[in-house]
Amino acid sequence: MADAASGARKASAHSQFGASGSPPPATATATGFDFGSYGRVGIGSDLRGHSGHAVNVVSFGSRLEKPAYLELNFYYGGMIGDDPEKRWRVVFVPGYSGDLFHATGNFSQNFAIRNAYAEVENLGVSGLSLWAGSRMYRGDDVYLFDFWPLDNLNTVGGGAAYAFNQKRTLLQVQLGMNRLSDWYQFQQVQVPARRLPSSTTVLSPQSATTTVTTLDRQRLVVSAKATQFVRALDQLPNGKIIVYGEFHYLPKGERQPEMVGQPPLPLPDDYGYVLGAQLGGWLRSFVFANLFFRHAGGLGAFGDLGRPFGFGSEQRVWGATENTLALSANYESQLLGVMAGGYFRKWSDANTAEDSGYSEGALAVRPTLYFTKYIHTAVELSYQVRRPTTVDQDAGRYIRPMVARASLIPIVAPLGRGTYSRPFIYGIYTLSWLSADAQYYLFEPQDVRAGRSIVHYLGLGVEWWFNSSYR
């Protein structure tokens, strides 16, 4: 009976944060400084003397050959007063992505701040938490494709969550803004200055100009999410139902022309939305299934960091749409673990005259045999296909790129059995078959990777996570 109760607690703790195998959130009870990390690093060859490379024709392809990505998670928090239920926490997460110095010899890296926020819990109202700052704001993922099909925001703002009904019901709201550095939201131009710059003299030939901001449009993104667990969180089996929505708004503006004498380009206000739902269930920890549906329109179809294109007649993207159906699942036993994931997406822009939209889908399954507690071997099989909506202009016909892949992955897992057991060190061999349309779609004729229907990838890699915050 004690083992069953312990398993229920473990499963419920896992389920509160997605039941998806994502890295768990920041520790909820630590006082003072705490630390966590997520990372993946790999190297590979195509067995033809070139760097190993991914061959994906869909928006979210296999994660096996993804480039290095690293995060360091720093936390500092404690109790409010003497009440252990009332807590505060500061989360700071720098992240790195790209080529490593040891591979390229270039001593410059691509860093970004992924999380920088503070939160308080149960202050004034039991079950209420408040946060503000810059944050990755995500739900459950499809691990095999490194894909968050329902809610995946990168926000600077704040939010609140309220858990009640013995934590079986959770309500969340978020409000944030961004101002992307692209022509659609921001512009600065040089204009004659009203006075000479301080760095020049009256006799200097340097022109007296200054930089002014002529376009500055902040996008507002508001989201709301409701989660209802089927049973109390300490009971198994269990399940949850999620409904989710977003609202996007971009105010009007005016863009200055590149050529002198041309009239400014008016940019009307624009809107977007996301509506979606998720159904999830689990028998025990890491034995689960999730089904997602997402419908997005206007700005919401591009995501919060997406740069709109394919405008309609009024320079709006209101007519753009995205529909996604996705699934993720995992099974664990003493000898075998099985991951599965897949999705279908249909995307269309707002330009009815020449739609750059597409339909795409991908499926993957990864069974893992546990030969010993620490030595495992996985086989991943996957298939992906993409169908652009319009005729390809160069080919003069509709194309349908397809890729089928098979990967063999020997694994050393120092923390034991489990498809989500991390860290793990692994070798990988992937054989990919590319249709003729996939070869045409992915590579220009001059590319050293072009003209191959069979692509090999032989490599080594490592992935880890511990005490990592993704919510």
Task: Describe each region flagged by the PLM.
Residues 31-41, 86-93, 128-132, 169-173, ...:
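Transmembrane beta-strands of outer-membrane beta-barrel proteins
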Residues 82, 186-193, 197-223, 252-256, ...:
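Outer-membrane beta-barrel transmembrane domain signature
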Residues 2-130, 163, 330, 367-369, ...:
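Beta-barrel outer-membrane channel/assembly domains of diderm bacteria
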Residues 32-34, 67-71, 87-91, 113-115, ...:
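Extracellular structured ligand-interaction cores
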Residues 38-44, 93-97, 133-137, 163, ...:
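Outer-membrane beta-barrel pore domains and translocons
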Residues 64, 103-108, 150, 317-319, ...:
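Solvent-exposed loop/turn segments connecting transmembrane beta-strands
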Residues 219-229, 233-412, 464:
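Detector for outer-membrane/organellar transmembrane beta-barrel domains
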Residues 42-62, 101-117, 125-267, 307-312, ...:
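Surface-exposed coil loops of outer-membrane beta-barrel proteins
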